[in-house]
Amino acid sequence: MAKLIVSDLDVKDKKVLIRVDFNVPIKDGVIGDDNRIVAALPTIQYVIDHGGKAILLSHLGRVKTEEDKAKLTLKPVAERLSELLKKPVTFVPATRGKELEDAINKMNDGDVLVMENTRFEDLDGKKESGNDPELGKYWASLGDLFVNDAFGTAHRSHASNVGIASNMKQTAAGFLMEKEIKFLGDAVDNPKHPFIAILGGAKVSDKIGVIENLVPKADKILIGGGMTYTFYAAKGMSIGKSLVEKDKIELAKKIMDQAGDKLLLPVDSVVATEFSNDAPHKVVDGDIPDGYMALDIGPKTIKEFKDALQGAKTVVWNGPMGVFEMSNYAEGTLEVGRALGDLKDATTIIGGGDSTAAAKQLGIAPKITHISTGGGASLEYLEGKTLPGIAAISDK
């Protein structure tokens, strides 16, 4: 269903509340990766260029104790945003009260204000993450319009997304949210064929909904990562010391029955005696020997997966093929990334931290059609679920 976009709103002279996703890694006040801040710039820039006042809300990490507040303040984020926008950004170290209200009332058209981490409200009874109705209503009262550009939290029903939206006459998606809905939505609902899904990661349980939703839609589903060996166990193969979810073996059997020859499992694996980069390792076909654990897909599988990708028109990749953070077990993930970067005339979509990190490490990120900013949110979207943060945005 088509949603209102920020460019559909008349923002001139308006106080525009924008829920952004500034949940960036920060250590000792230094931002490790500002991608999420950069991703929010088009929406913020649009509002201020069109004479609106941009009031930004975001969470940062999980705030469980008073001590967390010092580490999880949005102050460094506001400073970085100021550098990126090349203009002053007001930071207010409060999530409610007179200081915040006064600062908002002093804003001129084109000004930008960042208020403190919305999850500071979780210290007193999870008001933000529990979508406290009073908090949502209060935040909504601070603005005239609401724009949700935080796809990363769209699968959560929080006061700062659903709470504000339900107290506003008009809400819209930001440009980042629009892009996520377009690419992920097209992949799920209207993909160009051949449509290939590449799913990795440790657990079948994390990806089960995605696999079930994509089996009828995809032409091939390539499985890698630790979850491979739950499928191996379901086939009656030996898995050695490899990761296995025993309670998911029956489910894996059911999926294999449903998917038939659409499901491609690794035919060889890189195995080691210990979960360590320094452990002796080798490549084995099929069964995993006793005393060994599988930590990456092998060279024959890499070739099979690359062959399967040839001619693909839509590819969704979520999850690593092996223990990507250890160099000896990173090859599968890197080779799949290279193959994706080499595809011509295909819509390529990457989600998940490790897959995204691989794309950046390889320098193929510019060749990828869309890199999703939402981990859990993109997975739930691929599962075909309705995301509360998107459902709360006004329809066109």
Curated annotation (Swiss-Prot):
The enzyme's E.C. designation: 2.7.2.3
Domain of life, per lineage: Bacteria
Chief location of this protein within or outside the cell: cytoplasm
InterPro entries linked to this entry: Phosphoglycerate_kinase, Phosphoglycerate_kinase_CS, Phosphoglycerate_kinase_N, Phosphoglycerate_kinase_sf
Subcellular location, record wording: Cytoplasm
Binding site for substrate: 21-23, 36, 59-62, 119, 156
Alphabetized GO MF terms: ADP binding; ATP binding; phosphoglycerate kinase activity
Record's signal peptide: none
Pfam families, per the entry: PGK
Keyword DNA repair: no
One GO term (biological process): gluconeogenesis
CDD domains: Phosphoglycerate_kinase
Catalytic reactions on record: (2R)-3-phosphoglycerate + ATP = (2R)-3-phospho-glyceroyl phosphate + ADP
GO cellular component assignments: cytosol
Enzyme category, top tier: transferase
Disulfide bond sites: none
PROSITE patterns hit by this protein: PGLYCERATE_KINASE
Residues reported in the UniProt entry to bind ATP: 207, 325, 352-355
Keywords, sorted A to Z: ATP-binding, Cytoplasm, Glycolysis, Kinase, Nucleotide-binding, Transferase
Protein family (similarity comment): Belongs to the phosphoglycerate kinase family.
Subunit structure: Monomer.
Protein name, per record: Phosphoglycerate kinase
